[in-house]
């Protein structure tokens, strides 16, 4: 067995080591500025990629809509009527054609043009 003197010395040494290091459960070293900048850049990159994927999906939806043969309105504000009713069908298969809008739809379109 160890004597009480030896146990006391070991306890004092361990107490000194614990008090002098003062880690308190924190990381031993702080992150360097370059690591923080790297994490910031990674976050910005991921957000940018997410926005690009969202935009790509929206553009793909628009491309699919246009590729069905639906004629778009001219930029000068005049509207073109499609030649055939089959060309005027919505993408999701809704039988209501684009030319046959509800009164609420027409009101929304008129309000959006005035802005």
Curated annotation (Swiss-Prot):
Keyword hit for Signal: yes
Organs and tissues of expression: Highly expressed in the parathyroid gland. Also expressed in the placenta, thymus and testis.
Annotated keywords: Cleavage on pair of basic residues, Hormone, Secreted, Signal
Cellular component GO terms, alphabetical: extracellular space
One Pfam family recorded for the sequence: Parathyroid
Cellular compartment(s): Secreted
Main localization category: secreted
A biological process from GO: Rho protein signal transduction
Family membership noted in the UniProt record: Belongs to the parathyroid hormone family.
Its job: Parathyroid hormone elevates calcium level by dissolving the salts in bone and preventing their renal excretion. Acts by binding to its receptor, PTH1R, activating G protein-coupled receptor signaling. Stimulates [1-14C]-2-deoxy-D-glucose (2DG) transport and glycogen synthesis in osteoblastic cells.
Subunit structure: Interacts with PTH1R (via N-terminal extracellular domain).
Protein name, entry field: Parathyroid hormone
